[in-house]
């Protein structure tokens, strides 16, 4: 039969500890791999940001659509235990294949460090990701439900606590993996050419998935395993279709109404199946509003991360990168879950308040809505600090005097005086049809120029004499979306120069011309200037000042009297000033909402599902996550909202409306005990059929010898 009651630890079945460790390792594997995907697509395979993002979100969506398939396999064919084992094997193979796809030497026959056939790597990677999506999605609804199966009747408190521990394991694995795997990626490895170590970074998640599988199998002898119930989904669909058809045939008033529309299936299906379907449909009906929560929650990895790129990551002695702010969510979960279970919920119970599962979920949705209100308020404050970029019908220009004389620059409506080696304080904005000419005056010499300026762009006018100038299109229309710093160089030597800065090369910068911007993370960056016109005795190595977040600078390279280079820095875009720590309140609100919404949702889905449909209902719960991501694409894409704070308010308002609707729906929901209902049906069947000990033997645990 099942596990002995003596095999317990601290009042919990010993088997669940294997399940929790299994989940920790699996989540480490999944999130560690997922943290690398975008950079792998862009830097290794060479896709642009848009295609990389599309493939990434397609993969994530697939991971949340395949749980339906996993639930069907578990409930109709293999059972939860075997489904977890076999799909974990598929999962492990997928991780290994993905790691293989990142090995340069797979097609690098000439050993130059670049794959000779990228399509081969793409094909291998896609096969690996498909296997991972099938594996991780397939086991998602089974593991939590299988853990719930291990508890005896009367252990509801321990089972509820298990779902909290289970969720804690998920986030602990996620936190460690998102810290460790990026650290491994930046290491250098390779057989012939040393470069970013994607094979090992993907390989560690593959190893953890293998460990997850081994740990799960070790606990096999302790698990309670239930026989699969047959193709239950097919029965459910047929029963529902028959009920609808039968009701439609008997729609005239001469036929008496029945208590529930599913009761119209009684002519063909037994009452026990109908009662089970009623339980499932009532819960699925409650699921309808839930995707809106995930629509907001999953924007931590997109909109909130982009918001962080416009902020400063200096927090005391720490320096936080924009994408690392997501770890705040995981850290807060690890802190809040024990506090909620050990302090908050017991206090609420002592106060005599009936804090039901659906009430908790309603509170969670409200907190998530308030998190986006906080994000909107923060965005308004951030917008006040951001530079103004030109609109589609505008041009912006600043003047940089790289000559040896003072100059007066006359533009429509304003005149500025520039000393040698200086620039205007800020970019000046004009309608594209008003800036038709500029006067440059030096002493008694006046030159009128008619620059060609591109609408919607920033430009720099390099001037070194009234009749010697160059207009440079800056190419910056926004701050870096990664919080990086843009650096360009202007050469005033008569010969071209080359600059190497932190491994990036600015090649052949022409005389009195500017390079393109290249982008760097925060910190002090060293650079080397080289040219045929610079003597070997000259100093060539320089260091930048400390680069903060989101800035842009022009480094002017001029010749001293000795002919040696001299560097002058000019600020093009100021660094971010709002600190990322201001995001913590919104992360606290969204995480608090997640703790009372998501953990409770898992617990509620299990407790209200009949014994033969628990995995299906868990899959339905996970499906709401996929639908939530689709909502983000629809609202964000169709809304065309220019102000980000307004989009945050829109999402907050939508969830608030959905929260009210859900509260009303929850008000009319009646909690049931599926085990009691099924036991009553069993008792009734035994009375009707005394010769049969058990009409539904599938409800009994299976002997280990049968597995």
Swiss-Prot record:
Extracellular domain (ECD), as annotated region: 383-583
Which branch of life, at top level?
Eukaryota
Q: Which residues form a coiled coil?
A: none
According to the record, which residues are glycosylated? 50, 439, 498, 513
pH dependence (record):
Optimum pH is 5.5 for glycyl-sarcosine transporter activity.
> InterPro entries, from UniProt?
MFS_trans_sf, Oligopep_transport, POT_fam, PTR2_symporter_CS
For region Disordered, the annotated ranges are: 682-707
**Residue ranges annotated as Extracellular topological domain:** 22-53, 104-118, 183-198, 298-327, 383-583, 640-644
Please state the protein's primary subcellular location.
Answer: membrane
Localization, per the record, is: Apical cell membrane
Which keywords, in A-to-Z order, does the entry hold?
Cell membrane, Glycoprotein, Membrane, Peptide transport, Protein transport, Symport, Transmembrane, Transmembrane helix, Transport
**Bias (Basic and acidic residues) ranges:** 684-694
Provide the membrane topology annotation. Multi-pass membrane protein
List all topological domains (Cytoplasmic).
Answer: 75-82, 140-161, 220-276, 349-361, 605-618, 666-707
What is its quaternary makeup? Interacts (via extracellular domain region) with trypsin.
Q: What is known of its domains?
A: The extracellular domain (ECD) region specifically binds trypsin.
Protein family per UniProt? Belongs to the major facilitator superfamily. Proton-dependent oligopeptide transporter (POT/PTR) (TC 2.A.17) family.
- According to UniProt, the name of this protein is Solute carrier family 15 member 1
Q: Give the encoding gene's name.
A: SLC15A1
């Amino acid at each position: 039969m099942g596990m002995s009651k003596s095999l317990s630890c601290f009042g919990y079945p010993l088997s669940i500890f294997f399940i929790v460790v299994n989940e920790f390792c699996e989540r480490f594997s999944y999130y560690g791999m997922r943290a690398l995907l975008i950079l792998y697509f862009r830097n290794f395979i060479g896709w642009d940001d848009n295609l990389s993002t599309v493939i990434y979100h397609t993969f994530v969506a697939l991971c949340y659509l395949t749980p339906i398939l996993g639930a069907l396999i578990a409930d109709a064919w293999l059972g939860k235990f075997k489904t977890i084992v076999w799909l974990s094997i598929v999962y492990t193979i997928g991780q290994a294949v993905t790691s293989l796809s990142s090995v340069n030497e797979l097609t690098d026959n000439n050993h130059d460090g670049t794959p000779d056939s990228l399509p081969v790597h793409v094909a291998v990677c896609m096969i690996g990701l498909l296997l991972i999506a099938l594996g991780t999605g397939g086991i998602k609804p089974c593991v939590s439900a299988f853990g719930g199966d291990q508890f005896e009747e009367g252990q509801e408190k321990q089972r509820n606590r298990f779902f909290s521990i289970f969720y804690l394991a998920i986030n602990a694995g996620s936190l460690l993996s998102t810290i460790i795997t990026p650290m491994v990626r930046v290491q250098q490895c390779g057989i012939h050419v040393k470069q970013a170590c994607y094979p090992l970074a993907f390989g560690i998640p593959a190893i953890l998935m293998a460990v997850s599988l081994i740990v799960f199998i070790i606990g096999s002898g302790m698990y309670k395993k239930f026989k699969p119930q047959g193709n239950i989904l097919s029965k459910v669909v047929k029963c529902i279709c028959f009920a609808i058809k039968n009701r439609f045939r008997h729609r005239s008033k001469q036929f008496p109404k029945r208590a529930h529309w599913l009761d119209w299936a009684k002519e063909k299906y037994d009452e026990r199946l109908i009662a089970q379907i009623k339980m499932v449909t009532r819960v699925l009906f409650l699921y309808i509003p839930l995707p809106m929560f995930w629509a907001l929650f999953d924007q931590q990895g997109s909109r909130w991360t982009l918001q962080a790129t416009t902020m400063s990551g200096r927090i005391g002695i720490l320096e936080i990168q924009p994408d690392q702010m997501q770890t705040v969510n995981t850290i807060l979960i690890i802190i809040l879950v024990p506090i909620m279970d050990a302090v908050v919920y017991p206090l609420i119970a002592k106060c005599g308040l009936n804090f039901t599962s659906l009430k908790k979920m309603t509170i969670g949705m409200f907190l998530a809505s308030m998190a986006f209100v906080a994000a909107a308020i923060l965005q308004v404050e951030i917008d006040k600090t951001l530079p103004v970029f030109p609109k589609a019908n505008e041009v912006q220009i600043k003047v940089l005097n790289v000559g040896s004389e003072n100059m007066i620059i006359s533009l429509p409506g304003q005149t500025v005086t520039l000393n040698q080696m200086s620039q205007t304080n800020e970019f000046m904005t004009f309608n594209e049809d008003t800036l038709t000419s500029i006067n440059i005056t030096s002493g008694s010499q006046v030159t009128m120029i008619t620059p060609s300026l591109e609408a919607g762009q920033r430009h720099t006018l390099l001037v070194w004499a009234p009749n010697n100038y160059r207009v440079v299109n800056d190419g910056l229309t926004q701050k870096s979306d990664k919080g990086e710093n843009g650096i360009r160089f202007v050469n005033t030597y008569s010969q071209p120069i080359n600059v190497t800065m932190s491994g990036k090369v600015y090649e052949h910068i022409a005389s009195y011309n500017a390079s393109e911007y290249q982008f760097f993370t925060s910190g002090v960056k060293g650079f080397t200037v080289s040219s045929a016109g610079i003597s070997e005795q000259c100093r060539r190595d320089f260091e930048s000042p400390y680069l903060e977040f989101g800035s842009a600078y022009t480094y002017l390279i001029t010749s001293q009297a000795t002919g040696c280079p001299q560097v002058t820095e000019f600020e093009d875009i100021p660094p971010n000033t709002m600190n990322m720590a201001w995001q913590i309140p919104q992360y606290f609100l969204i995480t608090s909402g997640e703790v009372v919404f998501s953990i409770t949702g898992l617990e509620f889905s299990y407790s209200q599902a009949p014994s033969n449909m628990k995995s299906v209902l868990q899959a339905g719960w996970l499906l709401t996550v996929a639908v939530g991501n689709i909502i983000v694409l629809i609202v964000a894409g169709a809304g065309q909202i220019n102000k980000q704070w307004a989009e945050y308010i829109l999402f907050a308002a939508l969830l608030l409306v959905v929260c009210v609707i859900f509260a009303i729906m929850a008000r009319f929901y009646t909690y049931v005990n599926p085990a009691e209902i099924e036991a009553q049906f069993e008792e009734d069947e035994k009375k009707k059929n005394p010769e049969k000990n058990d009409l539904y033997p599938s409800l009994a645990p299976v002997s280990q010898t049968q597995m």
